[in-house]
């Protein structure tokens, strides 16, 4: 019965989003179909985030699990039905009156995520300081951008062993320890406040210093401290540019409250993308998204996109691979000890290369074997042989000779070119 349940769960994972159209490939993709162990579509090779798949609940579960057993449990709620932690993302709805000729209509804007601050004006300011194409307005390019970054920056398989492919019990234990470590030492969520509300010790509470002195002296001390803060020059930790005192700033607790960022500068130090929902990882005085923090700690398999917890793995083409995942990108044939060709940074076996990727010789019109020498000019190629690289008029061999190219033809002389024109 347990085995049946496990198989059913695995099947449900592969049914999610099945048949959804690809937003990148359009009609070229037959619809989303998840590869058995790669995190891509079997039909078009794009990721799930490139397809029109409704993932809001799944993403909320993923982020909820990330915050479980951390100080950020206030951002999650457990469902009564199954106890799964769900991310309580802050949705902001703004209503703006729009003047029309006869009456006034109401224009409503919904942000699929907004910083969880009580001051809605501050949240609105924060959104306005982001590039328009990255503002998560429902149904917009910005909402699609947020969806992609949730998938890219916070892969479920970087925190949940059940989302990985065939981990051994030892690897599961190592992964659980790794996740616990980064939750305790690196994970954080940015905080939006005005620069004048903070100092190097953290948020400034509203208090009157010198409680044992007279009220007048205490008020004077408070005014002096306020005046000092107004003179303070605030600059962004990322771009080093100055910050206006009345503009929202982002603070990262793990970085220390002496550092602050412009909203548009709160980015991963590796991919330079906005840190989705201000979720960051702090290491060596730098901000990282979840993916690139994990990459700085563990090798990642270029085949399945999972972190490698095994001591034995393959290194090829400046990438890392699980031993069983160094396979042809087209047919999944294991490439250990085999001839392969790299196509767009993906290894492809020789038969698949010849069938799907090889260039065609302009002379014999056959595919050019990857191990055979060729002559290439612009987008045209020839076998580097006396049978193929010939003058298109007189059939003189042109290897090592000067030639005149005309589209897919080559000529040995002006005379031959004129005869064919």
UniProtKB/Swiss-Prot annotation:
Residues 92-199 form the PET domain. Its main location: cytoplasm. PANTHER family: LIM DOMAIN-CONTAINING PROTEIN, TESTIN. Pfam families: LIM, PET. Interacts via LIM domain 1 with ZYX. Interacts (via LIM domain 3) with ENAH and VASP. Interacts with ALKBH4, talin, actin, alpha-actinin, GRIP1 and PXN. Interacts (via LIM domain 2) with ACTL7A (via N-terminus). Heterodimer with ACTL7A; the heterodimer interacts with ENAH to form a heterotrimer. The lineage of its organism: Eukaryota, Metazoa, Chordata, Craniata, Vertebrata. Belongs to the prickle / espinas / testin family. This is Testin. One of its GO terms (biological process) is negative regulation of cell population proliferation. It is found in: Cytoplasm; Cell junction, Focal adhesion. InterPro entries: LIM1_Testin (IPR034958), LIM2_Testin (IPR034959), LIM3_Testin (IPR034960), PET_domain (IPR010442), PET_testin (IPR033724), Pk/Esn/Tes (IPR047120), Znf_LIM (IPR001781). Keywords: Cell junction, Cytoplasm, LIM domain, Metal-binding, Repeat, Zinc. Residues 133-164 are annotated as: Disordered. SMART domains: LIM. The N-terminal and the C-terminal halves of the protein can associate with each other, thereby hindering interactions with ZYX. GO terms for molecular function: zinc ion binding. GO terms for cellular component: cytoplasm; focal adhesion. Residues 155-164 have a biased composition (Basic and acidic residues). It comes from Microcebus murinus (Gray mouse lemur). Gene3D superfamilies: Cysteine Rich Protein. Disulfide bonds: none annotated. It comes from the Eukaryota. SUPFAM superfamilies: Glucocorticoid receptor-like (DNA-binding domain). Residues 234-297, 299-359, 362-421 form the LIM zinc-binding domain.
């Amino acid at each position: 019965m347990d085995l049946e349940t496990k198989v059913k769960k695995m099947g449900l994972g592969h049914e999610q989003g099945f048949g959804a159209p690809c937003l990148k490939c359009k009609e070229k993709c037959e619809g989303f179909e998840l590869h058995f162990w790669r995190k891509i579509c079997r039909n078009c090779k794009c990721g799930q985030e490139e397809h029109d798949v409704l993932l809001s609940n799944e993403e909320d579960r993923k982020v909820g699990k990330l915050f479980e057993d951390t100080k950020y449990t206030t951002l999650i709620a457990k469902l009564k039905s199954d106890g799964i932690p769900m991310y309580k993302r802050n949705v902001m709805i703004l209503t703006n009156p729009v003047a029309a000729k006869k009456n006034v209509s109401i224009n409503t804007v919904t942000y699929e995520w907004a910083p969880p601050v009580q001051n809605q004006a501050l949240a609105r300011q924060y959104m306005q300081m982001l590039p328009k194409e990255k503002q998560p307005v429902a149904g917009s390019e910005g909402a699609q951008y947020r969806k992609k970054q949730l998938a890219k920056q916070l892969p479920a398989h970087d925190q949940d062993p059940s989302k990985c492919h065939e981990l051994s019990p030892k690897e599961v234990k190592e992964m659980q320890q790794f996740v616990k470590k980064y939750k305790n030492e690196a994970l954080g969520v940015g905080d939006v406040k005005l620069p004048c509300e903070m100092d190097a010790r953290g948020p400034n509470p509203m208090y009157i210093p010198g409680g044992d002195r007279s009220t007048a002296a205490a008020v004077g001390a408070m005014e002096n401290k306020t005046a000092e803060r107004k003179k303070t020059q605030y600059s962004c930790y990322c771009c080093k540019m100055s910050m206006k005192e009345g503009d929202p700033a982002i603070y990262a607790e793990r970085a220390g409250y002496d550092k602050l960022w412009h909203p548009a500068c709160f980015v991963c130090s590796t991919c330079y993308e906005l840190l989705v929902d201000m979720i960051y990882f702090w290491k060596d005085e730098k901000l990282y998204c979840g993916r690139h923090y994990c990459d700085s700690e563990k090798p990642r398999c270029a085949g399945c996109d999972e972190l490698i917890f095994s001591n034995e793995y393959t290194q090829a083409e400046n990438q890392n691979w699980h031993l069983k995942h160094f396979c042809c990108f087209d047919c999944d044939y294991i490439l250990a000890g085999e001839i392969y060709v790299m196509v767009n940074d993906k290894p492809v076996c020789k038969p698949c290369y010849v069938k799907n990727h090889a260039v065609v010789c302009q002379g014999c019109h056959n595919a050019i074997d990857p191990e055979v020498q060729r002559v290439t000019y612009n987008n045209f190629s020839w076998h580097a042989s006396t049978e193929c690289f010939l003058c298109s008029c007189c059939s003189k061999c042109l290897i090592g000779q000067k030639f005149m190219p005309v589209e897919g033809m080559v000529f040995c002389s002006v005379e031959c070119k004129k005869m064919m024109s």
